[in-house]
């Protein structure tokens, strides 16, 4: 107990070991779905799901432990939703890069992220990007996740006449996905910890009876991480065509992680004078996790908004995060269960997360068309072009153009002009490629 007090200063934060552990378990239950969802998504890129499962558990444990031990923050880290889908379905699936090259792009973005954090530029860059575009990025990624979820569940299918259409609702996967989604929403309404995780497990169990899935056991030694460990192709990622991808990874990581860290830390009462040094340490731990995750073999790692659940349960120190880290390490031994989770079992989780992300629409300034229109353009272009980068590009270009032609150019930060110019040059030079 004395060691824990010395490490985490529990009394100074008005908490105790029991409260911190309960908070850690609460946070873990709200985000444990990622150990099933991330391998499922990255498998679509051709990555070995067993190795990705191990990489997911390890980076979640290592990143969260560093957040707890180094920054003494009750915030958990894991591979982020949205960028994993962009990695698999766009960078690899649509653009044709290998997953090794895509990991190289994540590595480079992680190095950039680490550099701007070390030099104190992270907050400066974030403040230079319009709030409307920061908000729209979250909304657009939510819509992007939604269409992926509906496709994975078989609810939406391709159509030569209308691009997309309704799938066959009589198929068992569609029905099971719908049941899983309703279950998640109902459990969330009643504030049941681990609602998303329960939904995934429930649909997986149903798949054994109605989907032809086969139970492969529950516990086993962790699979090998060798197929993904240090398999990144950095030289391939340095080629001109993929630099656009690096920029997307970098920008989304920047806004998502920084916003989450600030939001959760503020709720925990940690963003006050005298405690900002710890926030800077949290930024560094978060940045290092992206770098490390690419080496292990997973898409970008980020701070999880679900950490707010642990803060709500009383978590105030890094002991909460360390508890989460230990639980992620324990998950290494349930690989047989993770290996039989079908895509239509994780689809309800994706769709629910997408629904939650759309609430950010209320943050847009609907009284100023020069703010709301670029935001909406950003959000809409992501799912409709099936590419997060295109949404960002059209959003920044539209924002700069509208401000310029309405006499509000002075309102635009220099960082926004630079990003808009980069995207415009890319479109002029490469078109829609």
Placement of each model-derived feature along the sequence:
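Membrane-interface helix caps of multi-pass small-molecule transporters
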Residues: 40, 65, 69, 90, ...
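Loop-to-helix transition at the N-terminal end of transmembrane alpha-helices
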Residues: 46-62
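Helix-loop-helix junctions within the multi-pass membrane cores of secondary transporters/permeases
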Residues: 2-38, 59, 80-138, 266-361
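Helix-loop-helix hairpins and the membrane-proximal interhelical loops
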Residues: 1-51, 164-166, 197-280, 424-425, ...
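Hydrophobic/aromatic residues within the transmembrane alpha-helices of Major Facilitator Superfamily
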Residues: 25-32, 62-65, 69, 150, ...
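Membrane-embedded alpha-helical modules
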Residues: 95-209, 322-433
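Residue-level signature of catalytic and energy-coupling elements of molecular machines
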Residues: 21, 41, 125, 194, ...
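Juxtamembrane transmembrane-helix boundary signature
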Residues: 60-81, 112
């Amino acid at each position: 107990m004395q060691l824990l007090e010395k490490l985490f200063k529990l009394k100074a934060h008005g908490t105790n070991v029991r409260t911190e552990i309960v908070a850690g378990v609460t946070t873990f239950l709200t985000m444990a779905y990622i150990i099933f969802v991330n391998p499922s998504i990255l498998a679509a890129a051709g990555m070995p799901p067993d190795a990705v499962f191990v990489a997911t558990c390890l980076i979640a444990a290592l990143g969260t432990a560093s957040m707890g031990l180094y920054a003494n923050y009750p915030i958990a880290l894991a591979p982020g939703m949205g960028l994993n889908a962009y990695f698999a379905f766009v960078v690899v699936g649509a653009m044709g890069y290998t997953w090794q090259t895509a990991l190289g792009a994540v590595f480079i973005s992680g190095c950039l992220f680490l550099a701007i954090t070390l030099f104190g530029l992270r907050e400066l860059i974030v403040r230079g990007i319009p709030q409307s575009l920061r908000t729209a990025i979250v909304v657009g990624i939510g819509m992007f996740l939604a269409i992926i979820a509906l496709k994975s569940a078989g609810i939406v299918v391709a159509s030569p006449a209308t691009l997309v259409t309704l799938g066959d609702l009589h198929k068992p996967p569609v029905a099971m996905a719908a049941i899983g989604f309703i279950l998640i929403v109902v459990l969330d309404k009643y504030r049941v910890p681990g609602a998303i995780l329960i939904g995934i497990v429930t649909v997986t169990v149903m798949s054994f009876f109605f989907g032809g899935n086969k139970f492969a056991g529950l516990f086993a030694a962790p699979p090998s991480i060798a197929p993904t460990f240090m398999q990144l192709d950095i030289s391939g990622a340095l080629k001109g065509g993929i630099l656009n991808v690096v920029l997307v990874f970098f920008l989304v990581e920047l806004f998502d992680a920084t916003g989450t860290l600030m939001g959760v830390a503020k709720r925990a009462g940690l963003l006050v004078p005298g405690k900002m040094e710890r926030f800077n340490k949290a930024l560094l731990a978060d940045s290092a996790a992206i770098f490390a995750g690419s080496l292990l073999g997973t898409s970008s790692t980020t701070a999880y908004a679900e950490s707010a659940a642990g803060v709500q349960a009383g978590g105030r120190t890094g002991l909460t995060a360390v508890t989460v880290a230990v639980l992620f390490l324990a998950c290494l031994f349930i690989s047989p269960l993770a290996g039989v989770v079908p895509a239509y079992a994780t689809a309800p989780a994706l769709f629910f997360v997408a629904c939650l992300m759309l609430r950010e629409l209320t943050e847009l300034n609907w009284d100023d068309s020069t703010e709301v229109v670029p935001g909406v353009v950003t959000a809409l272009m992501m799912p409709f072009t099936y590419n997060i980068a295109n949404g960002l590009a059209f959003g920044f270009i539209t924002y700069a153009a509208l401000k310029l032609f309405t006499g509000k150019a002075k309102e635009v930060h220099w960082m926004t002009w630079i990003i808009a110019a980069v995207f415009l040059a890319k479109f002029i030079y490469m078109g829609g490629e």
